[in-house]
A protein has these predicted regions:
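A short beta-loop-alpha structural element at the N-terminal edge
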Residues: 23-36
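Active-site rim helix/loop that mediates acceptor-substrate recognition in acyltransferases
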Residues: 33, 41-83
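A conserved beta-turn-beta hairpin within the catalytic core of GNAT-like acetyltransferases
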Residues: 87-96, 106
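Conserved acetyl-CoA-binding loop-helix of GNAT-fold acetyltransferases
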Residues: 101, 107-120, 131-132
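C-terminal "cap" of GNAT-fold acetyltransferases
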Residues: 153-183
């Protein structure tokens, strides 16, 4: 469990309704499911189900709760989520997403912290690497880079500049290639 302090200039923007701490990060639990869906709906709307990333997640069926991270405010309400899925592309890897933060808690670094903690859990589990679809500008500070052209395919259209990966183990991506699908 990680608790983020409520002090600092960015925290003040969040308002007092979030309490004294910005968030406590925990592994995802079944009782978080309904609140996670509300956060995801608020962040992405109904269009989230049309994304190529959703096709990957549908094929896997269940996120990895011990690797996924949920941010709770002082009232124990879900205000952020970063989900991890076990997938395979030649070798076992992880697929990150969705990442979402309640609008009232955005701009405080919570999204990056959720990703950092989820990636640390993946690394501790002995994973080869993490793949995601997202903004290189957002994820680059965490070590993610664009997947080399033609190396990975997703089950649908994706902007190649938004297909990112992060190697967790030395030579973790040496045999990773092809379509990202179920493990």
């Amino acid at each position: 469990m990680l608790t983020l302090p409520a002090h600092g200039p960015k925290r003040r923007r969040l308002g007092t309704h979030l309490g004294t701490n910005l968030a406590t990060l925990v592994a995802e639990k079944p009782e978080h499911q309904e609140a996670i869906e509300r956060v995801l709906d608020g962040a992405f709307g109904p269009g989230r189900f049309a994304k190529t990333s959703e096709r990957v997640r549908e094929r896997v069926a269940v996120a990895e709760p011990l690797l996924s991270r949920v941010a709770l405010n002082d009232a124990k309400e879900v205000i952020g989520v970063c989900r991890i899925w076990r997938v395979k592309a030649g070798e076992p890897i992880y697929f990150l997403g969705p990442l979402a933060v309640d609008p009232a808690a955005q701009l405080a670094g919570l999204g990056l912290t959720l990703v950092r903690e989820a990636v640390a859990a993946c690394r501790a589990s002995g994973g080869n690497g993490v793949v995601l679809v997202g903004s290189e500008r957002f994820f680059k500070p965490l070590g993610f880079s664009v997947v080399p052209a033609g190396r990975l395919r997703l089950p649908g259209a994706v902007d190649p500049a938004r297909l990112l990966w992060l190697e967790l183990a030395r030579n973790g991506f040496s045999n990773v290639q092809g379509e990202v699908g179920p493990p």
